Amino acid sequence: MLSVPDYEFWFVTGSQHLYGEEQLKSVAKDAQDIADKLNASGKLPYKVVFKDVMTTAESITNFMKEVNYNDKVAGVITWMHTFSPAKNWIRGTELLQKPLLHLATQYLNNIPYADIDFDYMNLNQSAHGDREYAYINARLQKHNKIVYGYWGDEDVQEQIARWEDVAVAYNESFKVKVARFGDTMRNVAVTEGDKVEAQIKMGWTVDYYGIGDLVEEINKVSDADVDKEYADLESRYEMVQGDNDADTYKHSVRVQLAQYLGIKRFLERGGYTAFTTNFEDLWGMEQLPGLASQLLIRDGYGFGAEGDWKTAALGRVMKIMSHNKQTAFMEDYTLDLRHGHEAILGSHMLEVDPSIASDKPRVEVHPLDIGGKDDPARLVFTGSEGEAIDVTVADFRDGFKMISYAVDANKPEAETPNLPVAKQLWTPKMGLKKGALEWMQAGGGHHTMLSFSLTEEQMEDYATMVGMTKAFLK
């Protein structure tokens, strides 16, 4: 399984020396208490570390520099306990190269009417301190996240948690490396894109390799290594021989397992975290990678079919963000246009992620007309029910655009005995007709990432962080 470093977030609160040392000690004590209780809540995926009370431009600037150069730190969380003159934040905020969350909160969640005096008022000035601070971020066009509300409330903690996942994905985005095995499908438009701009904006490195390089690695895989993977497959999934004889079935599965290990070793050696295949580029391969691709996707690798490196990179980012939970490569395949039944049946030839399965996936072997190779093994399953999002990235002359809408996912209304692939049914929440029209008008492609565990807000936050144009359809 691809791992993500154990990041942390540094938390600072703003104030000024005007209030005196005793008040500043109280500010630090309260901020430390907030950090401790956020960590103890069990809601946050990454630790919050309180660093200091920021009172001068010099200290803020030095702090932001330290954040930039500490690889363990994924971002900054700020809070204005008292009034903090925002000119002090200008230089440091301009220098900050990592995600910024402004937590607009207050240490206590009430007004102590019976006891309140001006000492209390001076100490608890978040109401206008946060506005002063928010102004300078808006003036600097920092496009930071603001979470508003009482820090001890579950909904606020959940917002912070979701943002932490996005911020970590942003940091990891600059480590995303896509290995393209073969080129994009010939004459297809939407899978093309500016790889240099993708590396500048999102940090995605995209490299091409000829199929011969990959075949050489696959051929090195030993029978003993395949035996181990076969046993693991038997322990995880249902092995369905179907109409195949035993030897044919087992050989087909073993070919895919050799591909899985060969591709994985190739990716590991080059530090790649995503990959693409293309059924038009299969020189020297017995089968189109089906089960092989699904197992790699299961392990956290991003994937794009037909050379679609943008979806492969997006998939890796979303898998980081979702902790590799219920987030799958998908393609709009066929439609139900009957009134009252409007839906999209999503699938792909072979490569849908088993993380969205509602039943135990079955390892099956069936013919595949496309590609001109032997019958490939694949995982067959039905997707899940619930709320999800469908997301794609397209490249236009003026830059990249993220297009997304919320969907209601369902299971097919009937069995599909002649369709031995993984499949997922869904309908845009805005309606199929309106959703499809607006998707096409925005230039959204047919390859997407479908996620049951991420929110549109998270994807919008990521798009904002990397400076991507957004078309979130409502």
Swiss-Prot record:
Gene Ontology cellular component terms for the protein in this record: cytosol
Cofactor field: Mn(2+)
Cofactor note (record): Binds 1 Mn(2+) ion per subunit.
Pfam family, any one: AraA_N
Alphabetical keyword list: Arabinose catabolism, Carbohydrate metabolism, Isomerase, Manganese, Metal-binding
Gene Ontology BP terms: L-arabinose catabolic process to xylulose 5-phosphate
Gene3D superfamilies, per database record: 3.40.50.10940
InterPro entries: Ara_Isoase_C, AraA_central, AraA_N, AraA_N_sf, Fuc/Ara_isomerase_C, Fucose_isomerase_N/cen_sf, Lara_isomerase
EC number annotated for this UniProt entry: 5.3.1.4
Molecular function via GO: L-arabinose isomerase activity; manganese ion binding
Pathway assignment: Carbohydrate degradation; L-arabinose degradation via L-ribulose; D-xylulose 5-phosphate from L-arabinose (bacterial route): step 1/3
Binding site for Mn(2+): E306, E331, H348, H447
Catalyzed chemical reaction(s): beta-L-arabinopyranose = L-ribulose
Keyword Isomerase applies: yes
UniProt-listed SUPFAM superfamilies: FucI/AraA C-terminal domain-like (SSF50443), FucI/AraA N-terminal and middle domains (SSF53743)
Protein function: Catalyzes the conversion of L-arabinose to L-ribulose.
Family: Belongs to the arabinose isomerase family.
PANTHER family to which the protein is assigned, alphabetical: L-ARABINOSE ISOMERASE
Name of this chain's protein: L-arabinose isomerase
Organism, scientific name: Lactiplantibacillus plantarum (strain ATCC BAA-793 / NCIMB 8826 / WCFS1) (Lactobacillus plantarum)
